[in-house]
């Protein structure tokens, strides 16, 4: 009866032919294998290759049985799981690489920042010393001018000597000399003032006390007489 229906109904005959052709061309389609790439994955998988090949061979020309479908679907899930795991591992490796790169850049930035901080500290220290030397040399230049005018003015002489006592200390400049902060011109001024103190002041300083009760005119006259007699 069924064969007679196939002969009389061309539509059913055509569907039967298509179904048979599909099974020959793609026998695992009924198990959810939708395309050729999935079939290739199944037949090339080292885990399920033998099982899949056996099912393909045994199911040629017929539909898959229930347990065969389950085996094929299980194999598909295994492949999908392996592919997902590979993608996750690849993503993790990429993330780790990016994190390491960020860490490397952060370490470089930290190192550069520390170098800049140290350089800034050294620059500030050097600037502070330079300002200190400049301040001292400025006082010495002022003192030098006062000593030049001290020939006939005793009060200025004593004022200059008082400043000498406060600021002229050769040992105070040892650190600046060793660090190269003290310039040649500044060192020359130090030498000049040292020579002037030794030759013009300490050797010829009159014995008029700094707290003398003499008037300004009397002090000038007394010191001038003692310096030039």
From Swiss-Prot:
The keyword Coiled coil applies. The keyword Coiled coil applies. It comes from the Viruses. Residues 66-94 form a coiled coil. Keywords: Coiled coil. This is Uncharacterized protein ORF92.
